[in-house]
Every structure is written in C-alpha cells, then in structure tokens.
C-alpha cells in the first residue's frame, strides 16, 4: 500500500495528498507533519518498511471539505486520492486514483466560497516586449484575457492583477522570475505564484488546448487568433484547470477580450486609498464604495457590481448606455419595485450552472435553478415596452426555460429535507416503475399478507402462513394436518416438528423485488436525475447568457435604489477637454455612514486656467474627504451610477492616481519619505492630461525646506507638463503664491472658525488660501496636555518673528515678480569640512592635521 501511496505522491509533489483508507483520508511523511500543524491533528506513525515509522495523521472522509478549506485558505493545494472500487475478496489492494486537486483558485464547494465575490485564478504569459494575462472563475465559467503591449506592459499586468484580485496565479518562467522580486507579492497584495509546467505555455500546445476546449477549428471568433501572448496565457490556464479538475470544463465556453482603451486604470494605491471594495481599517467591505452601492438581490449581481466598480468605463457611449437604464429605474417606483421583488426569486444561476457542468449539482441545485427559470417571464413582462436600449437588450437576452423548469419541478421533490442518501428526490407519480418499486419497499408487509390470503383461498389451508428467515428468505408454512392439500407447484424447503416449509416461484420473484427494491429505486432515481442534468448541460450557454442579463439588471436596480435613497443626480458625461464641474458634491460613503448632515461642496477643474487646485486648511478640516469624494464621483459616473451631487458634468478620466498618506516600509528598507517619493514618481511618469490626480501633503516626510521645494516643483510640473486635473492638499502655505504665476493653478481653502480660542470646522471649501494651520488647536482637540500646547504656542511666536521661510522669495520682490526658489550657493569642500568639524573636541595634533588637510584642499582648488 505504501508503495502505491509513494507513486501517487510523486505525481502530486506540490500537493498535500488525502489518501483514502476505508472511512478516513490519511496523510503521511511531510504531508502529515504539515497538515497536523495547520489542522491541529494528532500526529501518529505507521509501519512503512523503513527503519522508522512514517509520520501519519488522518481525518474522517465525511468531514473532508472543511479540512480542505482550511488547507486551501493557508495557501496549500490538496490532491484527493479516492478508492475507485469496492474492496473485493481475494484482492489485497483496491484501485485508487486522484479524482481532483483543490487549489486556492479552483475551490468549487459553496460553503468554502464567498457568494458575493468571484474566485478568480489568473495566468500570466510574459514575453520580451509584451505580455498577456487571463483570469477565470470556474464556478461561473467567466474567462477574460487582456493583452499588454505598451512600453510599461509589466506595470500594466500588475495593475490588472491587483484589480482582479485572484486567489491564485500561475505563469510562465519569465513571469515567475519577475514576480519573485515584486513587492506586491512579497507584501501580500497578490498571492505567491504557483509553479506549472512550462510546456503548457508553448504557443502550439496552448493553441491546441484552446481549440479542443472550445471545439473549434480557429480562434478567430474570440479575437485572439494571431495573438500569441493571449493564446499562451489562456492555453496555459485551461491546461492547468483540466489537470486539477479531472473533468471537462463545460461552462468555460467563451473568452472575453478586455482592452486597455475600454476601461479606466486603477493601480494598487488608488484601489486602496479610495476604498473601492475594501476599507483601509480592517480590509472588510463595510465602509467601502462596494458596501454602499451593493443593494443587489442576487449573488451574481453582487459579483458583477464588484467587477464594475474596479473597472470603470472610458467610453461615453457605454457609460450613457448604463446610465439610461438606471435613469428609467430611478424614475419609475413601480418598475423599480416590481423588478426588485422579482429578482429576490432568482437564485445564483451562474454557480448553479457551473455545478451542473462539472457534475457536482445536487437535486436541490436543479430545483433552485427551476425556481429561477420560472421567475424570468415576470421580469420580461416588466421590461416589455421599454424604449431604453439596455433594458431592451436585457430582455432579449433573458431566455424562456418554462418547459425545462416545469419538467424539473414535476420530477424533483421541492423539499430537500425529505431526501435521504442518493434517493427519495424524485417525485411520486413521475415514473411508474419507480412508484411500483417504492410501493414494494414501503408496503412489503401488505404485499406478503395479500399473497398469504390468496394462497389460503386457493388451497383451502386455513393455517397457511408466510414468514421470513435469513437462511432462505420468504417461505410458506403448512401444518402437518393440511399437508395433503399442498399444491404441486409448492417446493418443499424444510421439515419441522409441526409441519413443512415451502416456497413458490411467485413468492421468490416477489422476494427478489422486495429485497432489491432499494437498489432498483436508487438506480432509477440516478438515471432520471442524470437525464435532467444532461438536459440542463445542453442549455448551459442559454443559462449563462440569461444569468449575465439578470446580473446586469440587478446592478442597475441597485444603483437606482441607492440613488433614490440618497438623492443622487444623473451625471452628464462630457468630452475629455471639458471641465469637471460638480455642484453640491458629497462623499458617498461618509454621508451614508454618518448621522450628521454632510456638508456639500462644489468642484470646478478644467484643462485651462483651473486645472490644479491648491487646497490648504488644518488637519481634520476635511481636505482628504473632499479630494476623495471627487475621485469617487469620477468612478461612480464612469461605472454608470448616479452621483452624490446636485449636478455633475464629468469628463472621461483614463486613470485616477492617489498619493495619500504613507508609512515606513521596513520590509523593503523604504522610509515614509521614500514610499511617498516613489508614489509621486509614478504619477509624474504615467499621468496624462486625461488623468485625475489627488495628492495629499507631498513633501511632508522630509525637512521643511526640502519638502516645500519638492512640493513646489511637483505642482509646477503637473501644471505645465502633465496638465491633468489635480487636487493638491498641502500645509505649505507658500504654494498659494503660485496662483497667478503658473497658469492653471488656483487656491482653495477649507474654512474654519475660531471661537474663544477654539476652532470649529465648517467643512466648506472656498476660493483663497488658509492663513493659519491651526496645528496646535488640533493637537489640543486630540488631547495633548495643555502644558505642551502652551509651550508650542510660545515657540510658534518666536519662530514667526524669525520668519524662517522669508528667504524662499528674494527680498524686495513680490511673489508675482519672481517665484523661483532662491538657490543657496553650494559649499566648497573646505567649508563642508569646517562646518562638520567639532573644534572643541580637537587635540593640538588633530588640529594641525586638519589645517594641513584644508591647505591641500585650497591649493587643489586654485591649481
């Protein structure tokens, strides 16, 4: 047995092997050592023919899924090796084989999945000058591919990976080598790369894998026919999925090709800082934009919403296509309420279809799908007559499954609690033979009693009885006084003191049927259920198309419900050269999660005289909230949602960049300032005039003058070179002098009010610059001891007298006349040495040596 185990283990070296032995899955050697720690199992040993016993631990087979889930959550792969036959007499070993491999990206059990989130597995192919990545959720069948061929294609690949958030990533050798140095992977923002055979990424092998998967002779319909990188990425992934799942991937029947020019780019920092799908506090949904907007009624709608939020559109036509649908639902309470009620009747059609296609569907799954199918006609009725294109398209893509649904409901019991193991899920009355066998099983006593009565009447033997024993089954017992009346067709089996025992052919036939009824019932129910699953499998594409349409409707309805509740407006999508013009804008999440009335603010940013907003004001006044709310309004508008404002004109944004806050990255030996500058560099290098930038406190991680100089230069570069719409919050009030000097820079401040030495935050933004930071007042609000804040006030007065920043501009010149920072004369080598020397600590000899060194330096400078 151990030899067979070792052979199987060698074929699955990167997995923890669950090896079925009777009622347990056993693990041995290193697998046992690892699993015992991760699963908190008792470690024992087993004789294996070696000098030492093999480490061993095990779990009951019926509890396997919960243990598999724990191992997968810990990043492990699990190979399940099952007994493929029942134990037979004379055969020492039963045949065993690996029936599936469970990895983080291939989990299919409902209990181990978040129903509101896709469980993607991604595959990356990295070439010399371009690359591609694809991602798939095998529970829904969604497969998407994206080609990356810009000069910064590697960064683009990582941006997409962060956005998709796969549970598992595989890739070719070139990508694995690159990923080994990626901070995103080392820091845990992305999972570690799983090894997979390089041959699967060879273009010919990958192409053949895809042709076989989709049963086609060309990949032209999928728009990747001559795209080697996309073919390699997809082919490698499909090969991996087939190898782990051990069955055909029926529901993976299409490839969606995503293009860079179709959607806004959101990098790791933007996704995190804007809290689009997770909050920054604990990484949960609460407090994120997804949490706010997710009022969907179906699990598949919730998953689609998450994808929309992280992939805003950059096509005006497609955005308005969605907005028109939201507007119709927003405007009609009857339509919105009716669809909302009907959607509540829809189960997770996507994942139900996935379980049917991979053979894991239960009778309850099929019945749930039939309930969803029967709810669809009512949705189509509600959409009938709509003149809005997206609503018409949704209606057209919702198919009619009434006949299939009625067949399922006539065949399968509606109450799963009545099911026993492998039986009783087919309704009475659906199959005559099944009904007869159930009657035989459930009323065997009545059947035997009826035969007994018939035999008494035929033979005239009043004492005739039918009984049963384990030796020869049912028999007829006749007392000695009636032996002469026994018919010729009775076959004597046993003589007793008081009479004889007989059998008949009819009785034996009935016995066989009674004793085999359970097995026959099980066989017939399986046959009927297999036919139903086969019928559904034939219609998988129709089910998927319908599920996609219902998901889209669910998201649009969710947008409308949120917009109605919080009084949002329909944004007007304008050309990229138009201004970002929001009247009465609010932060959607802060507004929804606060009991206080949110103070609205306007925003006007264009490509001309007002493209950089310099925002000043004290901490806690609302600068960051204001900047984030405008970025979120961009995102909401471009996913097709109404926005929190009285009115909004939104130009198409290609990327949103954020530079908000920073922490020391000790793992990578990066200080707060280094992290900050890296983020700023990314913005300066990659932002375009179509981008939307929010930068908070640039330069704060270093000395005052260094920080101010950097912040000043960054503003200049953004205004004059990048020309992107920019919100720039700062405590460097000197930057307000740039208005009127650098074209496009405008000053704004968050208003506060001083009352009796205390500050009141008014949260209102207006033109101008703040003349005071109120840092000491904020410190007092935070609970800093009064003795410290009083001392701080005294020091501040002294510093203000010296005016340490007056040298930032040449004396006798107004800011408008000369805004260049005054360059300090560089120090000579001699001056550097003198300034760095502690003269008081020099010995006479050391002083003499220093003078000689300085003399040599001076002579060198004058040669």
Name what the model sees in each region.
Residues 1-328, 337, 341-344, 348-357, ...:
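Charged catalytic and DNA/RNA-contacting regions of genome-maintenance
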Residues 3, 7, 14, 533, ...:
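Conserved phosphate-binding elements of NTP-dependent enzyme cores
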Residues 29-32, 227, 297-298, 303, ...:
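ATPase nucleotide-binding head domains, primarily ABC-like/P-loop NTPase cores
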Residues 104-113, 248, 387-390, 449-461, ...:
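Active-site phosphate-binding and catalytic loops of NTP-dependent enzymes
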Residues 201-209, 213-216, 265, 280, ...:
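Amphipathic heptad-repeat alpha-helical coiled-coil/stalk segments that mediate oligomerization
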Residues 358, 362, 375, 428-429, ...:
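Charged, surface-exposed helical/loop "interaction arms" that form contiguous linear patches used
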Residues 496-534:
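Extended, charged coiled-coil "arm/hinge" scaffolds of SMC/Rad50-like chromosome-maintenance ATPases
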Residues 827-863:
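C-terminal tails and terminal domains of large nucleic-acid-associated
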């Amino acid at each position: 047995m151990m030899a067979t185990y070792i052979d199987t283990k060698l074929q699955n070296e990167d997995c923890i092997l669950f090896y079925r032995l009777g009622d347990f899955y056993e693990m041995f050697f290193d697998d046992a050592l690892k699993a015992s720690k991760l699963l908190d199992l008792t470690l024992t040993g087993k004789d294996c023919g070696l000098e030492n016993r093999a480490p061993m631990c095990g779990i009951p087979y019926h509890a396997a899924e919960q243990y598999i889930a724990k191992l997968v959550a810990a990043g492990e792969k699990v190979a399940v090796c099952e007994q493929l036959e029942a134990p037979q007499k004379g055969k020492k070993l039963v045949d065993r084989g690996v029936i599936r491999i469970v990895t983080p990206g291939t989990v299919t059990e409902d209990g181990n999945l978040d129903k509101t989130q896709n469980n993607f597995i991604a595959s990356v192919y990295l070439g010399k000058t371009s690359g591609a990545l694809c991602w798939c959720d095998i529970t829904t069948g969604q497969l998407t591919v994206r080609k990356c061929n810009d000069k910064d294609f590697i960064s683009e690949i990582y941006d997409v990976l962060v956005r998709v958030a796969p549970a598992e990533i595989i890739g070719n050798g070139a990508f694995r080598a690159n990923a080994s140095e990626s901070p995103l992977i080392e820091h845990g923002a992305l999972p570690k790369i799983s090894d997979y055979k390089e041959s699967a990424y060879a273009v010919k092998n990958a192409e053949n894998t895809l042709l076989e998967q989709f049963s086609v002779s060309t990949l032209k319909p999928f728009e990747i026919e001559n795209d080697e990188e996309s073919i390699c990425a997809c082919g490698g992934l499909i090969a991996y999925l087939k190898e782990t799942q051990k069955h055909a991937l029926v529901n993976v029947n299409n490839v969606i090709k995503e293009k860079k020019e179709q959607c806004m780019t959101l990098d790791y920092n933007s996704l995190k800082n804007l809290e689009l799908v997770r909050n920054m506090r604990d990484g949960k949904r609460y407090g994120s934009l997804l949490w706010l907007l997710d009022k969907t009624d179906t699990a598949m709608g919730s998953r689609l919403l998450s994808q929309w939020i992280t992939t805003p559109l950059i096509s005006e036509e497609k955005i308005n296509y969605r907005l028109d649908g939201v507007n119709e639902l927003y405007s009609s309470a009857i339509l919105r309420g009716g669809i909302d009620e009907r959607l509540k009747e829809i189960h997770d059609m996507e994942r139900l279809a996935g379980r049917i296609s991979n053979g894991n569907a239960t009778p309850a799954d099929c019945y749930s799908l039939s309930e969803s199918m029967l709810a669809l006609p009512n949705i189509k009725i509600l959409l009938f007559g709509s003149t809005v294109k997206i609503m018409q398209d949704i209606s057209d893509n919702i198919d009619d499954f009434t006949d299939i649904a009625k067949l399922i409901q006539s065949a399968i019991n509606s109450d799963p609690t009545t099911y026993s193991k492998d039986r009783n899920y087919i309704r009475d009355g659906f199959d005559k033979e099944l009904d007869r066998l159930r009657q035989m099983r459930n009323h065997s006593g009545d059947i035997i009693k009826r035969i007994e009565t018939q035999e008494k009447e035929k033979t005239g033997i009043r004492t005739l009885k039918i009984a049963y024993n384990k030796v020869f089954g049912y028999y007829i017992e006749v007392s000695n006084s009636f032996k002469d009346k026994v018919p010729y067709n009775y076959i004597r089996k046993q003589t007793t003191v008081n009479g004889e025992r007989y059998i008949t052919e009819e009785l034996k036939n009935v016995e066989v049927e009674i004793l085999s009824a359970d097995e026959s019932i099980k066989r017939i129910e399986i046959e009927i259920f297999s036919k139903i699953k086969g019928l559904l499998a034939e219609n998988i594409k129709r089910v998927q198309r319908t599920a996609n349409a219902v998901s889209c409707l669910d998201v649009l309805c969710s947008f409308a419900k949120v917009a109605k509740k919080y009084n949002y407006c329909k944004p007007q999508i304008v050309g990229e050269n138009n201004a970002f013009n929001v009247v009465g804008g609010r932060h959607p999440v802060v507004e929804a999660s606060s009991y206080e009335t949110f103070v609205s603010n306007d925003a006007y940013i264009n490509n001309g005289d007002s493209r950089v907003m310099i925002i000043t004001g004290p901490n806690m006044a609302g600068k960051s909230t204001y900047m984030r709310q405008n970025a979120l309004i961009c995102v909401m508008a471009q996913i097709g949602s109404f926005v929190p404002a009285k009115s909004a004109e939104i130009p198409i944004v290609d990327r949103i960049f954020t530079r908000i806050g920073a922490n020391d990255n000790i793992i990578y030996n990066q200080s707060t300032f280094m992290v900050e500058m890296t983020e700023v560099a990314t913005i300066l290098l990659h932002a375009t005039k179509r981008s939307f930038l929010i930068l908070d406190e640039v330069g704060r991680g270093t000395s005052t003058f260094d920080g101010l100089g950097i912040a000043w230069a960054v503003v200049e570069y953004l205004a004059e070179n990048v020309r992107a719409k920019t919100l720039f919050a700062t405590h460097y009030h000197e930057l307000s002098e740039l208005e009127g000097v650098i074209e496009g820079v405008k000053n704004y401040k968050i208003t506060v009010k001083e009352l009796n030495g205390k500050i009141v935050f008014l949260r209102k933004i207006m033109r101008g610059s703040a003349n005071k930071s109120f840092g000491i007042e904020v410190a007092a609000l935070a609970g800093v001891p009064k003795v410290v804040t009083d001392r701080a006030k005294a020091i501040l007065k002294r510093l203000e007298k010296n005016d340490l920043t007056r040298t930032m501009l040449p004396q006798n010149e107004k800011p408008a006349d000369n805004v260049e920072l005054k360059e300090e004369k560089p120090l000579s080598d001699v001056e550097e040495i003198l300034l760095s020397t502690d003269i008081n600590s020099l010995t006479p000899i050391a002083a003499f040596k220093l003078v000689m060194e300085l003399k040599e330096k001076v002579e060198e400078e004058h040669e």
